[in-house]
Amino acid sequence: MVTRVGSGFSVQRVWLLLVIVVVLCGSVTQQASAWFTNDECPGVMGNRDLYEKVAWVCNDCANIFRNNDVGVMCKKDCFHTMDFLWCVYATERHGEIDQFRKWVSILRAGRK
């Protein structure tokens, strides 16, 4: 009889551990997707690849000038700033300006 109680107790521990793992995994997933939902760009959900391409310009610009504030200002208002255009030229991607404008308009879709 003691072995049953002992084995029942270990089964409870296993279930408890399983529940904790599932809850923690769900929490991590929500935090990862929150980065995109809390962003200033309403069209980023479903367009993460576009967001990454446009954000890459800002990251490169911040690296060129060794100043994180440049990258932050570039991404402000969902890339709809003169700082973003300045970074496009600073990273010598001015030939792609029309493509970047299309991508930014997609990312800004639904914005009030």
Curated annotation (Swiss-Prot):
Name of the featured protein: Gonad-inhibiting hormone
Entry's localization field: Secreted
Stated family: Belongs to the arthropod CHH/MIH/GIH/VIH hormone family.
MF-aspect GO terms: neuropeptide hormone activity
Native source species: Homarus americanus
GO CC term (a single one): extracellular region
Entry keyword Disulfide bond: yes
One of the GO BP terms on file: neuropeptide signaling pathway
Signal peptide start and end residues: 1-31
Swiss-Prot/TrEMBL keywords: Amidation, Disulfide bond, Hormone, Neuropeptide, Secreted, Signal
Task of the protein: Inhibits vitellogenesis in female animals. Plays a prominent role in the regulation of reproduction/molting processes.
Entry comment describing in which tissues the protein is expressed: Produced in the eyestalk X-organ sinus gland complex of male and female lobsters.
Disulphide bridges, residue numbers: C41-C78, C58-C74, C61-C87
Keyword check for Secreted: yes
Highest taxon of the lineage: Eukaryota
Primary subcellular site in the record, as a coarse category: secreted
Residues recorded as bearing Alanine amide in the entry: A109
